[in-house]
């Protein structure tokens, strides 16, 4: 389910009310030096003025002034806006200024590229896009535009002017004007600013200001932006949307409205009901019935995104999903819910955000979720079903939802629950590598790997590809020059969590370097990503997920050698994980064993030295070679 795009904005009615010196804000040399250091662009002004005229009508004006310092910042000067049924882009003006603040070019609404075409099959959103650039840097662009909603709205645009990396903010202003008796709620995250509130005739005006916000330098294992960036969310306590009305004063009230949208959407034709019973009536176990219907859903339907009808919030009726053989996350989840209900199994419609793990418990807004799954309560353990991708085993909690908060619908409303996540030790890679090196130094390699749980997710569906598509994927995993892949075998194993077995053979004439008396052998055949930390750590260290990697490498040699040099045996443990490595020579066979475990979680920035040392030790290991001397 697409995030509701009721946002984005319009012309500020009076530019002088937003900043007192328009010329200054357009000149590059007037920027504080602190805002220019290490960035590609500076938001000089991000001013939003939203007026809720009534529950059906809202106008949002926006003025965005961006100084682009170099080519990396050019994208931040482009204009993009989305509208949908019930909203429209009314005005647009873009002006380009040189470094001294002199006007060089003006564009308007007639220059826009507006398209309703998208990758989705059914979508009533329109994308409006326009690029405005200069061949010389720096330059400044001022955009002014207006979006109106005339048939109700469910969200009020947020105030989120700050960027995580690369872009600093000089000044952000947000003004919300409402009738005196209009009720709304707001939630500030990562900020303590309070609004300035005034009464102007019959209207209430609330104003928020953010100033001088510097971005962070890109660093390893940065926390999720939503947990760091200051932003404010808004929602109307009551709303009218697509000819329906509801309340958003709490999740319980919002849940009642969404629950009403689900009623009557679980209908099945008699033929479809008969099919459900033909699949399940001979299956004695409840869980096996669920698995059978889950598999049937995947075999008989395919996923498409559908953003029509009530802004994409109401699912397609279950009988239509089965008849047409298509559905989005809402429709497919609701369809499986209907089939389960037909055979006496109750389930819950669930909304979750695949990008942001958190849902604010004290602010109910549709924009906080963007996806729908299904929950089947069970005494033996609840099943969470991803209906858009049945290549996942039934009940498997994939990485885009594991540990996220979700809205679970039951008994006429909704409540927040946290979706479980798996322990790090369940995410595993087990690798066995056998290498034969001939007298000319050519390497012949056989690899057998097993990927389990989260580590298997990137490989699901790979078995359906042709070998021509599989080869570059495998080569991208390897650090082997002049690698020729000879054979590939991929198997997806039917277990409770994703399990993929991958084996292949390859060869290389120069993976090993050789001279008359010595061989220089890398410590690993695999590409190993290194964590690059800044010299000074500003934020806590957040490792998104953990895993265990076990690797055993056996190398058969053509002649007798002795080990002249190698990476020392390693055994390291820290708050971020552990690493052990040993290398030995037995006759003409080298045995190298490595086990690395990474622990997910958030560590205080004061631990950066310990964690940096841990990842640095691993990087140092991969960079070393085993040096053998011919006897």
Indicate residue ranges for each PLM-predicted region.
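Early extracytoplasmic/domain-onset interaction patches
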Residues: 21-82, 421-449, 482, 486, ...
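Secretory-pathway-linked proteins and extracytosolic
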Residues: 22-28, 148-160, 164-308, 424, ...
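Solvent-exposed beta-hairpin/edge-strand motifs
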Residues: 24, 80-110, 168-185, 461-487, ...
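Cysteine-centered nucleophilic/redox motifs
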Residues: 64, 139-141, 174, 293, ...
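Surface-exposed, acidic/Ser/Thr-rich flexible loop segments
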Residues: 76, 81, 125, 134-189, ...
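A surface-exposed beta-strand-loop module
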Residues: 92-162, 192-229, 432-436, 484-518
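Hydrophobic/aromatic-rich core segments of domains that either
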Residues: 331-421
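Long hydrophobic segments that form regular secondary structure
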Residues: 411-511
